[in-house]
Amino acid sequence: MAKYIFVTGGVASSVGKGITVASIGRLLKARGVRVSVQKLDPYINVDPGTMSPYQHGEVFVTEDGAETDLDLGHYERFIDVNLTRLSNVTTGQIYSAVIQKERRGDYLGGTIQVIPHITNEIKSRIAAVARQTGADVVIVEIGGTVGDIEGLPFLEAIRQMRKDVGRDNVLYIHVTLLPHIGATGEVKTKPTQHSVMELRRVGITADVIVCRSDYPITDEIRDKIALFADVDVEAVVPLHTVDSIYEVPLVLEEAGLGAYLTQRLGLSASRPDLDDWRDLVARIKAPKRKLAIALVGKYVELHDAYISVVEALRHAGLHQGVDVDIRWISSEQIEEEGCEPLLHDVYGIVVPGGFGDRGIEGKIAAAEYARVNNVPYLGLCLGMQVATISFARHIMGPESRANSTEFDLHTPHPVIDFMPDQLDITDKGGTMRLGGYPCKLTPGTRAYAAYGVDVVVERHRHRFEFNNKYRRLFESAGMIVSGQSPDGRLVEIIELRNHPWYVGTQFHPEFQSRPDRPHPLFRDFVAAAAKTFREGDQRPLPLEQNGAVTEHEPHSR
């Protein structure tokens, strides 16, 4: 029988539950324990696919096409496992399922209530993870903060789980914040005491308290928390703020959490092997030269909107021995000020995914700037599409008004257009091309050199695609289709022939990058940027003109 670790949060949101859960998964995996992870989100949306990035951050897409919480990205990167739609459950999903069953008559005329119908549905989703993955331990994070009204059904469900599967098979971890009072220099425990009491009111007694703090906590503070929370001192685990999230598993291991969980759950575990992880952290902390990379987007005020892109860049930088210095550039600011003041000193440009026409001309300008000035460029989803639009306007002239039908339904040159199977779809949620699809690579291209295989599977999230009516024109002018669907109908990767490194992907490679195994395209993109950086950018830079190549003065960065 699988065992379950339930992780709740107290005092404040964003205390680091997701990273804590991912780190616990890493500690157990290092002991040979089979682990799976699940996130329970109390919001009423069915999934985050239609939510504003400003409210939710990134939408992480799983291999099987689920639009999920960004914490699943942390789980995958730390534990190195591909999760499925089972790993993210929302209140919207639970109520939708229960109402559908009621409409079918599954409840035989009974009165549908939160207990037992909603809680039973939640418990069935939790059990499904263990059943379908064969995990020894399922770690379940409950989103939000203890005391939130929308989280009560989830807390009741995990309370019942201890009775359903046996007390020895369930463990509760409470992640809480210890605020620091600057005026007195004290770390305060009172909010944690109250948070533990709030958890007890719903019938859950925490077995472990993980104490988040910006400062190291003393043994005296641990003793005090242990007394009021009624746990072993060993179960009060300090977790102070660190420079890199990848240090967290080592901090928790040093605090004895891995050994404590193994003992409390009676797991058959081997000696922990964290040597590779320690080496990873040592390389992260080693001094490195900074490499400026611009990330041009419309949600740059909230870095979590692009968290997988950020992590993929860091993974690639670590592999290349450089510290990627991300310059957050608003595409709307480019529209106002132009590219030169904002991009003149960067060595690579990334344009990530997005939707809507706000700031779109700034993204197109960034793609054009990278092409003209031979700055290494990586376009992701929309970033590939704006590169296509930029190239179309270059070879056909700005008066062509080449565009995507997403931004101009009446453009005379729709070089990016609706996918045929999207034309009759009116609903927004869960209706895009989602999840992993195969991509056949073209030998002799940068994409093929990066991957080193003929066919790859990458994750998608889009409604629009390259318009194949323009494919022959583009290829004759110097844009190569270096990846396509196996049937040849969908362009997946484009790149420029006469450029140091210019690649756009219709998919999202950032979702499959790992700290110890950077994604091949990010790896080679950062390598190209680092090469420019190390050479001092003194190369002559060719400027394409309708397929021809001319020389102009080196661009100064």
From Swiss-Prot:
Residues annotated as domain Glutamine amidotransferase type-1: 292-535
Residues where CTP binds: S13, D148, I149, E150, K188, T189, K190, P191, T192, Q193, K224
Pfam families in UniProt: CTP_synth_N, GATase
SUPFAM superfamilies attached to this UniProt entry: Class I glutamine amidotransferase-like (SSF52317), P-loop containing nucleoside triphosphate hydrolases (SSF52540)
Keyword field: ATP-binding, Glutamine amidotransferase, Ligase, Magnesium, Metal-binding, Nucleotide-binding, Pyrimidine biosynthesis
Biological or metabolic pathway of the protein: Pyrimidine metabolism; CTP biosynthesis via de novo pathway; CTP from UDP: step 2/2
Cellular component GO terms held in the UniProt record: cytosol
Listed GO MF terms: ATP binding; CTP synthase activity; glutaminase activity; identical protein binding; metal ion binding
Region (Disordered), start-end ranges: 536-557
Keyword Chloroplast: no
Quaternary structure and partners: Homotetramer.
UniProt function note: Catalyzes the ATP-dependent amination of UTP to CTP with either L-glutamine or ammonia as the source of nitrogen. Regulates intracellular CTP levels through interactions with the four ribonucleotide triphosphates.
Protein name: CTP synthase
Organism expressing this protein natively: Roseiflexus sp. (strain RS-1)
Designated gene of the protein: pyrG
